[in-house]
Structure formats: C-alpha cells, structure tokens
From Swiss-Prot:
Annotated Mg(2+) binding sites: 25, 54
Protein's UniProt name: Geranylgeranylglyceryl phosphate synthase
Species: Chitinophaga pinensis (strain ATCC 43595 / DSM 2588 / LMG 13176 / NBRC 15968 / NCIMB 11800 / UQM 2034)
Gene3D superfamilies with a match to the protein in the record: FMN-linked oxidoreductases
EC number, as in UniProt: 2.5.1.41
Assembly with partners or alone: Homohexamer.
Lineage of producing organism: Bacteria, Pseudomonadati, Bacteroidota, Chitinophagia, Chitinophagales
Function comment: Prenyltransferase that catalyzes the transfer of the geranylgeranyl moiety of geranylgeranyl diphosphate (GGPP) to the C3 hydroxyl of sn-glycerol-1-phosphate (G1P).
Length: 252
C-alpha cells in the first residue's frame, strides 16, 4: 500500500512545516463552484483538499474529486462521514475511528462493513483517531455519531484519548470541534495533546479567522482544517493559508 500522503504529513511535521487543508462538503458545492475553489486554493498554496461531511446526500463524490484533480495539483483526501463516502479517484482516505466516543459502530463496526470496499478501491488508507471536542453547540457530527464530545476544558481527557489512539496504532490524530462550532478548540488543549503525541495532529472546527489558525499551529497543530468559514467567504482561503504557513519556524 502506497503512503504518499501520510509520508507528506510525517515529512512536513518533522521539518516543522505547518499545513492548511480546505474542507469541502460535496453537498454544498456545484460544478461551477469547484473551478473557482480550485483556482483560489492553488493561488493560496493550500496543501490539501479534504472532501466529505457528516451527511453526504448527493451522489456526485466521484465527479467532485475528478474535477478537483483535473483543475489543480493539490492532493485530495477523503474525510468520510460514513463508509459509503469512498472515491477511488482521491489520493487518500482518512479512515476515521471516533475514539472520543463510546459508540461501537464508529469505533469498529462500520469499518468491518466498509473494509472490503475500501481495500478494493486501492486508496491510500490513513488510520485516524478522531477526537470530538465540545464546540459550544450541538453539531451534525455529534448528532450523527451519537457520541458525547470531550468537554472543551478537559485537556487531560483529550490528551489521554489521543495517547491511547496512537498506542493502538492510529497514524494521525484529528481533533475536531465539529462543523460550525461556536468555539474552536483551545490552544491549551492542543498543546497538551501535542506534548504527549508524536503522530501528526489535525485540528478543525470553529476556526473563523487567520489569527486562530496561526495560534493553533503554534500550540502544536500540524494541519489546520477549515470548511464552514470558507464556505461563507472564499476570500479567507489565502488569508488563512498564509497564517498557517507563517507559523513554521524560520530557517537560518
């Protein structure tokens, strides 16, 4: 199994280079939007395009992936809300296990059902410990996953959860406050997790401005994911990408 995308996560982390990913929900874009998004992502030097959502009702995931692949050279990584969200045209798949919850279906149940199709797709599969953090309001992901998020002020619980995920073999930790969260994850929580986990840390949910993206990187996030804010204002793509890239250490 090829590991090009995962290796890029590892290489960038080792060099202290921070990455910016734009999260796009296939339900919320039409073919006309994709050309504009691809151009803006390319101009902003976006590192990854994450594609998926808690609910993907439409069936044009393949078309969406292929359009991005045609229009830009940015790697497309699937961020699936369910096992059905698989496209063989993508560069990689984040194989999410909701380790912050106690819903067995999202820890392993759905993975058992989806494993044959995922393997057949030939996609690069990146095992991902998904840690849902309370963002101050019920989110689609907490409702759909039927799990209780980790309280936003319980840094040690988040740390221990991420540590357990890494020791169980998860290659990546994804800390998420959920789409449209009122409050993003605190820097103190990110820092606590980063102090004990060597796997790449992805952080998303509730990040609405460039300063927050920058501070999250400084706290220990390796990849910043923004979706909801960009859906509302695509001009933020360059602003946030620049802030994330500016958080890398200065090479002498």
């Amino acid at each position: 199994m090829h590991n090009k995308i995962y290796n890029s996560f590892i290489d960038r982390k080792a060099k202290g280079i921070k990455s910016f990913a734009v999260l796009i929900d296939p339900d919320k874009v039409n073919p006309a939007d994709i050309a504009d998004l691809a151009a803006k992502c390319t101009a902003a030097k976006v590192d990854y395009i994450f594609l998926g959502g808690s609910l993907v009702i439409t069936n044009h995931l393949d078309e969406c992936v292929q359009q991005f692949k045609t229009l830009c050279d940015i790697p497309v990584v699937l961020f699936p809300g369910s096992p059905s969200q698989v496209s063989r045209y993508a560069d990689a798949l984040l194989y999410l296990s909701v380790i912050s919850g106690r819903n067995p279906e999202l820890l392993i149940g759905q993975h058992v059902l989806s494993a044959p199709a995922v393997k057949k797709s030939g996609l690069e599969v990146i095992s991902t410990g998904y840690v849902l953090i309370d963002g101050g309001a019920p989110t689609t992901v907490s409702y759909i996953s039927n799990t209780t998020p980790i309280p936003s002020d319980k840094d040690d619980i988040a740390m221990c959860t991420a540590m357990a995920g890494e020791m169980l073999g998860m290659k990546v930790v994804f800390m998420d406050a959920g789409s449209g969260a009122r409050k993003p994850i605190t820097e103190s929580m990110i820092s606590r997790v980063a102090s004990q986990v060597s796997a790449p840390i992805i952080v998303g949910g509730g990040i609405r401005d460039a300063e927050k993206a920058y501070l999250n990187c400084k706290a220990g996030a390796d990849i910043i994911v923004v979706g909801n804010a960009i859906e509302k204002e695509t001009s933020l793509i360059k602003e946030m990408a620049d802030a994330v890239h500016a958080a890398a250490p200065v090479l002498k």
